Curated annotation (Swiss-Prot):
It holds the Pfam family PseudoU_synth_1. GO terms for molecular function: RNA binding; tRNA pseudouridine(38-40) synthase activity. Homodimer. This is tRNA pseudouridine synthase A. It comes from Thermosynechococcus vestitus (strain NIES-2133 / IAM M-273 / BP-1). The active site is at D62.
Length: 284
């Protein structure tokens, strides 16, 4: 944890730990005429400090993507004690955005560029019976049984530093497709399949394209060798389907000295333990 930082005459930089349900947002980044997470948070802060602010996030999540542990920074000219900011902002924010915590950080601390890693989780709900409570948070995938062990095995070679242009959607201004993948996992918990990737950064659309291709391996439509060849040979044209955004969540962001305990991020995620509720219909 960081030591306390005194505010300067030019303002105090705050780190914010943010949770949001992305269903009704057009992503994080401010867009003219669209409802975005960045805009609603900036409006809430500006209404308190009476000056415009810019809130910078560690990861710019796409339309419909959720966050349990998004981290952002903002510089404010205000005498408000740091510990009061979450309560003040939550009273002004819509119900689908929550400030979980705030911390004072040095003036040069940057939510995006100071980060060492980001961790995303993609969740599939595989029972044939729909679940209204899981619908906003998962991809309801019940069309074919998934070989989760095969999916987990084919993910492992991704660990390391690789060109991952096969999982890079068009529309990004990023100059390269190098990604350092630090950890991967794929596991089943009852009717849920959870895919997690931790990396130094993520390409535009990377997780959803990766999951879309991985599911093809799990259902037997594509071989493990084909999956590996596609990303190693950068065959972007063969990655034709992106998984829906509803199943994707930014779990957390890591820093050399984190302003927040990681537990604050992970505890915010609902932990569903679901067995099949329609065994007579189950195809798994």
């Amino acid at each position: 944890m960081m030591t306390a930082i005194a505010p300067s005459q030019s303002g105090q930089r705050l780190a914010l730990l943010i949770q949001y349900q992305g269903t009704h947002f057009h992503g994080w980044q401010r867009q003219v005429g669209q409802r975005t997470v960045q805009e609603v948070i900036e409006q809430a802060i500006a209404s308190v400090v009476n000056h415009p602010v810019s809130v910078v996030a560690a990861g710019r999540t796409d339309t419909g993507v959720h966050a349990a542990g998004q981290v952002a920074h903002v510089t404010v000219n205000s005498p408000i004690p740091v510990h009061r900011w979450p309560g003040i902002l939550n009273a002004r924010l819509p119900a689908d955005v929550v400030i979980r915590a705030a911390a004072a950080v040095p003036p040069d601390w940057h939510a995006r560029f100071s980060a060492l890693w980001r961790r995303y989780r993609y969740t599939l709900y595989t029972d044939p019976c729909p679940n209204i409570f899981l619908r906003p948070w998962t991809w309801h995938y019940y069309y074919a049984p998934l070989d989760v062990a095969k999916m987990a095995a084919v993910l492992q070679p991704l660990v390391g530093r690789h060109h991952l242009s096969a999982f890079h959607r068009s529309g990004s201004n990023r100059a390269h497709s190098w990604v350092e993948v630090q950890a991967v996992s794929c596991q089943r918990r009852g009717a849920l399949v959870e895919i997690e990737v931790q990396a130094s950064g993520f390409l535009y659309g990377m997780m959803r394209l990766l999951v879309g291709l991985l599911v093809q391996v799990g259902q037997g439509q594509r071989s493990p060798a084909s999956f590996t060849e596609i990303w190693q040979q950068e065959q972007r044209h063969l990655v034709k389907y992106a998984a829906p955004p509803s199943g994707l969540c930014l779990l957390g962001v890591g820093y050399p000295e984190s302003p927040f305990p990681l537990a604050l991020c992970t505890e915010a995620m609902p932990q569903f333990q679901l067995a099949s509720v329609c065994p007579e219909l189950s195809i798994a």
